[in-house]
């Protein structure tokens, strides 16, 4: 006896980083093929029916008039995956001969929407926004139509990461500040505020050579990429960091001298 398709109570969709779709009961729905994954991603981000021609042109502009071929294949793969999961296709897809879209009730949660809502909400902590960002949008799909949205979301993430690095530093969490700043620099070496945080961290916990190396890295990348010098506030942080390391070195030397003097007195 053929199983009856289940009504959809909402899909949980992850598009940031690894592509994942889960049913309301937590089961992962596997969609095979990058074209099918790209189609679902575009439909989830659009949230309204669009003409099939417009969808095909967005996803496969290089195919010109033949783009409906890849669309038919991707739609077939998508329908097959949803049906294999036992879902009622009519409750997920809104489709006719001209248009295609996801029904609004088909999505219970979308990580992109949660992340954007958090970055828009002044009461949502930047730490929460950073935690919700699982990776760049549509990683590995390679479709140019996602490039603009991917960059926009990445900018929001990097802005939140910069705030997190600064907040951790100000709260005394030097290690957490270092990790956040290094992650930001790994994504964008031109983020001067992240370099400044690392300079400050090295000033508080590191050595003079670490402070100097970090400052020189910043100077080099700014000169090479922008033909600019560090901002005055970064220079001020650099001077403070140098002074902190020098003070610690002198304190250690003084302790060593006192210890040596005490030992000599005991021997004498």
Regions found by a protein language model. Give the residues of each.
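Intrinsically disordered, charged and Pro/Gly-enriched terminal/linker segments
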Residues: 1-6, 28-30, 34-36, 45, ...
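Short amphipathic alpha-helical interaction segments
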Residues: 66-77
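Short capping segments at the starts of secondary-structure elements
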Residues: 42-55
């Amino acid at each position: 006896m053929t199983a009856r398709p289940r009504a959809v109570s909402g899909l949980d969709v992850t598009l940031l980083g690894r592509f994942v779709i889960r049913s309301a009961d937590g089961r992962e729905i596997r969609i095979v093929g990058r074209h099918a994954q790209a189609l679902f991603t575009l439909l989830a981000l659009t949230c309204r029916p669009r003409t099939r021609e417009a969808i095909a042109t967005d996803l496969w502009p290089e195919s010109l008039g033949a783009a409906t071929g890849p669309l038919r294949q991707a739609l077939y793969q998508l329908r097959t995956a949803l049906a294999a999961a036992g879902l009622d296709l009519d409750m997920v897809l809104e489709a006719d001969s001209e248009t295609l879209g996801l029904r609004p009730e088909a999505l219970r949660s979308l990580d992109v929407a949660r992340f954007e809502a958090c970055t828009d909400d002044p009461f949502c902590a930047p730490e929460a926004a950073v935690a919700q960002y699982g990776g760049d949008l549509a990683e590995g799909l390679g479709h140019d139509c996602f490039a603009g949205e991917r960059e926009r979301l990445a900018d929001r993430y990097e802005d939140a990461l910069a705030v997190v690095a600064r907040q951790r530093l100000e709260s005394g969490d030097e290690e957490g500040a270092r990790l956040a700043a290094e992650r930001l620099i790994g994504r964008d070496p031109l983020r001067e505020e992240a370099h400044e945080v690392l300079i400050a961290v090295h000033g508080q916990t590191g050595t003079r050579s670490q402070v100097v190396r970090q400052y020189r890295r910043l100077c080099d990348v700014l000169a090479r990429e922008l033909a600019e010098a560090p901002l005055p506030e970064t220079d001020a942080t650099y001077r403070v960091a140098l002074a902190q390391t020098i003070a610690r070195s002198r304190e250690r030397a003084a302790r060593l001298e006192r210890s040596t003097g005490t030992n000599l007195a005991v021997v004498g």
